[in-house]
Amino acid sequence: CLPDPAALSRRCTHPGGERRGGSGRGGAASGRRRVRFVSAVPGPEEPGSPRGGRRRRAEASCAKPRRARTAFTYEQLVALENKFRATRYLSVCERLNLALSLSLTETQVKIWFQNRRTKWKKQHPGADGAAAPAPPAAARCSPSPPRPAALPGQTFPSYAATSALFPAASPFPPGRPRRRTLRSLLGARVPRASTPRTSENPPRLCPSAPGVRNRVFLLRLASTKRKNTYML
């Protein structure tokens, strides 16, 4: 516990520590005593103090490490600028090929093009809409299929060449009557699909055919024989 300030003021009269009316060794011994008051609130730390250095180290360790900037060579910058003049948006395949040719990573090429586009838009504020959007990734990487005419050993004649391959036949060949051609055309018709007939209308046999008569007679004879056998 801290001593009472009123009691201390009685003992210590001035910074020298001498007592009023005190003399001898007792007064000198009591005057040598000095009281130090330690404040509970810490004061401002000096830049060279050890506590300030520790706090700076802790803040530096907690801060996010800064990524090092990529140092491009002159040849790489020239190649990137030429590619940017050709197109401001790279596809995935073009970006990968450019990174391999320049010994860079795909991320470095992507970030360089993003920064270059931002710089170009600042230099040309009215030409933002002129930049063509990047095509989708599926359409960019997939190569276009070859045309049918480019395949070896295959030819696809156009519609205009069909007349040369299949010449139009004359409607009526010369020297032949018109009736024969009509009969030949009618005889070459494709037969229609026969519809199944119901049991109510059985097919009628032509009585004029001799073979059909014999079959009908045999069927009737067989049916009468069966009836006779059943009756017996």
Curated annotation (Swiss-Prot):
GO terms for cellular component: nucleus. Keywords: Developmental protein, DNA-binding, Homeobox, Nucleus. Transiently expressed in the birth zone of the whole spinal cord regardless of the axial level. InterPro entries: HD, HD_metazoa, Homeobox_CS, Homeobox_NK-like, Homeodomain-like_sf. GO terms for biological process: cell differentiation; regulation of transcription by RNA polymerase II. It is found in: Nucleus. The keyword Nucleus applies. Residues 1-64, 122-150, 185-208 are annotated as: Disordered. The keyword Transmembrane helix does not apply. The gene is SAX1. It comes from the Eukaryota. GO terms for molecular function: DNA-binding transcription factor activity, RNA polymerase II-specific; RNA polymerase II cis-regulatory region sequence-specific DNA binding. Residues 126-142 have a biased composition (Low complexity). Belongs to the NK-1 homeobox family. Gene3D superfamilies: Homeodomain-like. This is Homeobox protein SAX-1. Residues 65-124 bind DNA. It comes from Gallus gallus.
